Amino acid sequence: MSNDTSAQPAQSSLSFTQGLLVGQLSVVLLIGAFIKFFIFGEASPSSSRSQTRRTSPHKRSYSISGARDLGSRSLKEKPSSNVLRPVPSSSTNTRSILRKTYYSANPTNFTSKHGRHRPHHSTHQPESLDWFNVLIAQTIAQYRQTAYILKDSPTSSILESLATTLNNPEKKPSFIDDITVTDISLGEEFPIFSNCRVIAIDDPSSDGGRLQALMDVDLSDDNLSLAIETNLVLNYPKPYSAILPVALSVSVVRFSGTLCISFVPGTTQTSTHLATSPSNIDPTLQTNDYSGANRRGNRRQERTDTEQATQANNAGTTGIPKTSLAFSFLPDYRLDLSVRSLIGSRSRLQDVPKVAQLVEARVQAWFEERVVEPRVQVVALPGIWPRMGRTGVRGQEEQQEVGSSGNAGVSTANVSMLGARDAGAEGSHATRDADMEGLRYRRNASPGDETSGVRYSPQNQDSREQACRDDPFRIPGSLPDVVPVT
């Protein structure tokens, strides 16, 4: 009896263990089958498997598996060009954009006067653009500070760039000697934008036209000036027979106008078409030729240079179209200039009216040939996709340049807007900004200066200002010892 009772618990425990194992195994098999047939898909047949299927004529196929193969093939084996869904034309239409953004604008009313169109202003309430003024002011202030930091750089200095541009041998006449920049002032005030409104204009290159933003801009800054010195050379009967020293100072007293901004669709020929299209040339500007054949030749040369610069700017796209920003000013702008001149060596003439008229006319023509309707400036917009090369940390004191090797000679702690400056740097910048007075860059008058670059000295600045107050006709950077004409 004792042997029977001991065998029964052993058999019961063994049957319980077997049942537990079988149950667990069945659950695992069910879960695996569910994952395999309901979650995972079938693997794509390899080349060897497909060849085996072609060579085996006795292999049977079922209708259910065939239908499943057709369905998976229709979903997986789509051409790559059909992966991206097409954009409906209604979503890029100007009316659709205005309707979805709750903006009411009237269409453009085209007239035949001078080949231009006169748009009706939108019925939407104009915007004040106070936030935009703050952003633009911060950008301009940063550019001014960066230009001052780079004043000693041999390649990135604004002084060297202006000197290279003014002394271009292909554009400078032979009777003008080397031009020396004696004074640069980047100004102290900022432009004020206001009264922004959006209009719809017709554009043959885009379906449904495009939108254009009009905004009023006003700038009053007496410290935005440029002073140069040069010599007029008499090359007859022999080269450099005589020279006439000339000193000029041009200041922008006030500028006001209407700025037009629009986005140009991404086409590879957008910039060239806008810059050289015959329909975009105003006949009134063609007839306003005050210098004859030479002026027309210079304009053609400048248009060629503009086209080459545009092509060079778009060379980095490698054929990939980019959306561009086109901006221009309406012809009813106002540009007030203050031109001061000093001509002569021993007996000098100050503020000659004819010289002021010639300089103002040349500046006006230069401005109209570039950014006044119907001519526009087209700028390719950079990519805004987040990249690690452009990633920075806000508030970090020491920022290292990430992904850019061209600015190795510039201290990132001074020019980076992301890094916070230390207390000593802030104190030096505050003292410098208080003494800079418009960021005027002047050449050091000392002949023994080894760097011969642009230097700023508060003592020299105070002495020059005192001399200017004593003599109201003195030009910043002009020739010394003015002798009135008797």
From Swiss-Prot:
Keywords: Endoplasmic reticulum, Lipid transport, Lipid-binding, Membrane, Transmembrane, Transmembrane helix, Transport. Residues 51-61 have a biased composition (Basic residues). The keyword Transport applies. Residues 125-382 form the SMP-LTD domain. Residues 80-96, 269-291, 307-318, 401-412 have a biased composition (Polar residues). Pfam families: MMM1. One of its GO terms (biological process) is protein insertion into mitochondrial outer membrane. Residues 70-79, 429-440, 462-473 have a biased composition (Basic and acidic residues). This is Maintenance of mitochondrial morphology protein 1. It comes from Coccidioides immitis (strain RS). The gene is MMM1.
